[in-house]
UniProtKB/Swiss-Prot annotation:
Key assembly factor specifically required for the stability of axonemal dynein heavy chains in cytoplasm. The gene is Dnaaf10. Disulfide bonds: none annotated. Pfam families: WD40. One of its GO terms (biological process) is axonemal dynein complex assembly. GO terms for cellular component: dynein axonemal particle; RPAP3/R2TP/prefoldin-like complex. This is Dynein axonemal assembly factor 10. WD repeats lie at residues 63-105, 115-154, 162-205, 207-249, 257-297, 319-357. The keyword Cytoplasm applies. It comes from Mus musculus. Gene3D superfamilies: YVTN repeat-like/Quinoprotein amine dehydrogenase. InterPro entries: WD40/YVTN_repeat-like_dom_sf, WD40_repeat_dom_sf, WD40_rpt. Component of the PAQosome complex which is responsible for the biogenesis of several protein complexes and which consists of R2TP complex members RUVBL1, RUVBL2, RPAP3 and PIH1D1, URI complex members PFDN2, PFDN6, PDRG1, UXT and URI1 as well as ASDURF, POLR2E and DNAAF10/WDR92. Interacts with PIH1D1; the interaction associates DNAAF10 with the R2TP complex. Interacts with several dynein axonemal assembly factors. Keywords: Apoptosis, Cytoplasm, Repeat, WD repeat. It is found in: Dynein axonemal particle.
Length: 357
């Protein structure tokens, strides 16, 4: 692919903020996004921005008692577009951003900080009930139904006597009908665990030897296809989730990408073979996954096992000197994304030529 044909990653707008920003998410069906974080005085903040004539307009600033670590619209209806957040106090809140004084849902979900959150069943993505999953430093992963107060519908915690590991990332997947749904969780010691929510069992686990920073299925609402896991030592792994071997599990390909921690992975909503990873030194890498000619083969005992594909780097660019801790593609406009970094900046990026790859 010549330089002229390659996608370009362009910083469209950048804005300095007066707080540490941990997460950023597009508001579905709009030119707006939210940023979440904490002020130096120790309180939490949610800001709503809108893109107007090539600039960012602050529409609303909401201050809360506890610093806000993560957020998702994934369990909200397209009509309401409520934001679910996890904070440093272990609280799960759901906010109506039009009237944010009091949360529409509130539960003390965890004993310690909620590091990570994901949603499914809202926004027309995924069959079945709307659900939120949270992962915490307290070692537990909990699934919540916003229509049901107080208690989680599922609680994945270490058995008694087991060490509690810090859960850094969670992701929903396999939500292709009313019954099926999985949660994948990644931990600070390199463990990846796949929980089947239909029969409440641990379906698969592996260890990638370094802390798991980010997990994402290429699509939440299809039969599991691919899972990307990023880690501390600059590596990421792509698992082919179509074929599970009874002892070897899922086939995977590993790529050494950034020179430092790979903080995030996000698949392009309009093409599941393309994904962006963000690095600890402010870099963004755009990748394409290529399937092998055959996705499965039989082993010596006649059992089906998966065959991993390959990844190719389409483009990379450095936009900051600090880790890019959050990234979100616009679900509506191909190639538009928002990212935030620890230099207290939020950036709107445009990735070109994605329709021709």
């Amino acid at each position: 692919m010549s330089t002229f044909e390659k996608p370009q990653i362009i910083v469209h707008i950048q804005k300095g903020l007066n707080y540490t920003v941990f997460d950023s998410k597009w508001v579905p069906c709009s030119a707006k996004f939210v940023t979440m974080g904490n002020f130096a005085r120790g309180t939490g903040v949610i800001q709503v921005y809108e893109i107007q004539r090539g600039d960012l307009k602050l529409l609303r600033e909401i201050e809360k008692a506890k610093p806000i670590k993560c957020g998702t619209f994934g369990a909200a209806s397209l009509q309401q577009r409520f934001l679910a957040t996890g904070d440093f106090g272990g609280n799960l809140h759901i906010w109506n951003l039009e009237a944010p004084e009091m949360p529409v849902y509130s539960v003390k979900g965890h004993k310690e900080i909620i590091n990570t959150i994901d949603g499914v069943g809202g926004l027309g993505i995924g069959e079945g009930a709307p659900e939120i999953v949270t992962g915490s430093r307290d070692g537990t992963v909990k699934v919540w139904d916003p229509r049901q107060k107080e208690d989680p519908v599922a609680n994945m915690e270490p058995a008694q006597g087991e060490n509690k590991r810090d859960c850094w990332t969670v992701a929903f997947g396999n939500a292709y009908n009313q019954e099926e749904r999985v949660v994948c969780a990644g931990y600070d010691n390199g463990d990846i665990k796949l929980f089947d929510l239909r029969n409440m069992s641990l379906r698969w686990e592996t260890n990638i030897k370094n802390g798991v920073c980010s997990l994402e299925f290429d699509r939440k609402d299809i039969s599991m296809n691919k899972l990307v896991a990023t880690s501390l030592e600059g590596k990421f792994h792509v698992f082919d989730m179509r074929t599970q071997h009874p002892t070897k599990g899922f086939a995977s390909v590993t790529e050494k990408a950034h020179k430092s921690t790979v903080w995030q992975v996000r698949h392009l909503p309009q093409n599941r073979e393309i994904f962006l990873t963000t690095g600890g030194a402010g870099s963004l890498h755009l990748w394409k996954y290529e399937y092998p000619t055959q996705r499965s083969k039989k082993d010596s005992e006649g059992l089906e096992m998966g065959v991993a594909g390959s990844v190719s780097l389409l483009q990379n660019v450095t936009v900051s000197t600090q880790p890019i801790s959050s990234l979100d593609w616009s679900p509506d406009k191909r190639g538009l994304c928002v990212c935030s970094s620890f230099d207290q900046m939020v950036r709107v990026l445009i990735v070109t030529k994605l329709q021709t790859i």
